[in-house]
Amino acid sequence: MQATATTLDHEQEYTPINSRNKVLVASLIGTAIEFFDFYIYATAAVIVFPHIFFPQGDPTAATLQSLATFAIAFVARPIGSAVFGHFGDRVGRKATLVASLLTMGISTVVIGLLPGYATIGIFAPLLLALARFGQGLGLGGEWGGAALLATENAPPRKRALYGSFPQLGAPIGFFFANGTFLLLSWLLTDEQFMSWGWRVPFIFSAVLVIIGLYVRVSLHESPVFEKVAKAKKQVKIPLGTLLTKHVRVTVLGTFIMLATYTLFYIMTVYSMTFSTAAAPVGLGLPRNEVLWMLMMAVIGFGVMVPVAGLLADAFGRRKSMVIITTLIILFALFAFNPLLGSGNPILVFAFLLLGLSLMGLTFGPMGALLPELFPTEVRYTGASFSYNVASILGASVAPYIAAWLQTNYGLGAVGLYLAAMAGLTLIALLLTHETRHQSL
């Protein structure tokens, strides 16, 4: 009864200072760019960059060097979460979100404008790595700020629904990235694509950045942060406070995100690689056919994100996430061999649709759950840090571990790996308290 009364009192005090539509667009635009960038960079790192930015000789070495630049962003992201989290918790959410979007956007456009190895030699891969590091820094501060923008401007009883707005950017970005590559494959020859066509998606992201900046600049500061600022309760070093006074919830938040990241990268990067690789290594399906399957399956992802937010508001974050994580474990144990391993396009699509729909369900509540674990004075840093450390543990290595397990132990071992990661998330959830009724 105490928690309910607190919630109702808080709701009576709630007065929106930013329109719902502005909050929606401003919070999802950054994650849309993030996932758009993820997929276009991952694709270009395999297909284009080894030929453009690295000396020609050993093609395998060039591909590995190119993929290493992809991994740089995962190292940069926790650094970005600490840097942008520091200013987000001390200066304000609005200014920091503008800065993170600018950092991410400028770095992405720069990649699309970089000259190749044939033009500037060794400076080409160095500048590519630097731009990728800049992307990672911006990304490190993006999601946490977007989640706070949504949840700190939300009516208390709709906090998880509002908190799902940033997660909607993921399927939107992924859908447009896939669509862009399909469109380019229809309109351009291979020679045109390798010459200049690959640059189009990177430069096009500038449009999204401009829209995002326009909306974010017009927002008012979060009312929750303004209370802390007026009371002068900001801490001097948010990361230091986080790692000394809030270690337990930081670790729990990281492991709560683990299954989400592992599931997404297995369903997208690994499944794409396995489905298109020639037999006996993979299924040998046409690349464009798999891209279409992923685009259609991502619709299920997008639909489930707000559904998950509604469920988390109705039944609580912890309870709904425990059920969803259990479903991920069952999917991991029983779906890989019969569906993905069948090689039948209909069953492969069913696998992708099921997995990405579960991704929407597990990702949807995160925008409320992670921020609610932390007090206002370290919330930006805490939510961002947990989210981005989980990206190293669950995202950066997942496709490689999955490929190694499949090669050495078969497809079922990939499912066991996903089930194990989801099991760690389930334990973290069981050790976490319910946060639905608490005030921010």
Swiss-Prot record:
Residues 1-34, 88-108, 151-167, 214-248, 311-320, 367-384, 432-440 are cytoplasmic. PANTHER family: INNER MEMBRANE METABOLITE TRANSPORT PROTEIN YHJE, SHIKIMATE TRANSPORTER. NCBIfam families: 2A0106. Signal peptide: none annotated. Gene3D superfamilies: MFS general substrate transporter like domains. The gene is yhjE. It comes from Escherichia coli (strain K12). GO terms for molecular function: transmembrane transporter activity. The chain crosses the membrane at residues 35-55, 67-87, 109-129, 130-150, 168-188, 193-213, 249-269, 290-310, 321-341, 346-366, 385-405, 411-431. Belongs to the major facilitator superfamily. Metabolite:H+ Symporter (MHS) family (TC 2.A.1.6) family. This is Inner membrane metabolite transport protein YhjE. PROSITE patterns: MFS (PS50850), SUGAR_TRANSPORT_1 (PS00216). It is a multi-pass membrane protein. GO terms for cellular component: plasma membrane. It comes from the Bacteria. InterPro entries: MFS, MFS_dom, MFS_sugar_transport-like, MFS_trans_sf, MHS_symport, Sugar_transporter_CS. CDD domains: MFS_ShiA_like. Keywords: Cell inner membrane, Cell membrane, Membrane, Transmembrane, Transmembrane helix, Transport. The lineage of its organism: Bacteria, Pseudomonadati, Pseudomonadota, Gammaproteobacteria, Enterobacterales. It is found in: Cell inner membrane. Residues 56-66, 189-192, 270-289, 342-345, 406-410 are periplasmic.
